[in-house]
Amino acid sequence: GIHTNHGMYSTLYSFPTIMKRNAMKGSVIPVYSGLPTVLKDNGYYNLFFMTHESQYDNMNAFFRTNGFDEIYAEENYPKEKIANHFGVQDDYLYEYAIPILNERAQSGQPFFTVLLSISNHPPYVIPSYFHPKSDKIEDQIVEYADWSIRKFMTEAQKQPWFDNTLFILIGDHGKLVGTPENEMPESYNHVPLMMYGKGITPQAINDFGGQI
């Protein structure tokens, strides 16, 4: 797909994107069987963290109906941390999540968490405390996104739940690059997937795959 709602819908609930429709919107919200609901049925506690306000794309209602126990959004964050209409910046989102995940881990119940970042989406905002090396704003924001993830992973490594956690990094969709040759630019469908966890042997897999 070409929008965040497409990627979230397909990745979490294993349904193909309906290109001209946001499947998460509607007066009646369907209940899907997907990763959050299956994990919940097997004893997991599910959390969702987003940078922006919770009703964007009807996310709050949709995800609460479909397996998530807690949702954290712009309404939960201090006003001084709001950077623009997309809410807080990535590094603060990750920083905010750590103590909440620690609290969940202390309960002894396994948990599944989605952290939906925003930095690599225009309008780009580079925090004053981050000093990029690149000249172009498009490259600077990638540096910032990378730095934010590194900062989160460094802090996560200090937590007791780290060794028993599988981290999955995936994009919601690709980005338009160059001059498209098709009605649906192929670059929109080039989405990276990374898995990181204790005991996983480093390797690159080049097989074709999809979010569903």
Place the predicted regions along the sequence by residue.
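Solvent-exposed soluble domains appended to multi-pass membrane proteins
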Residues: 1-212
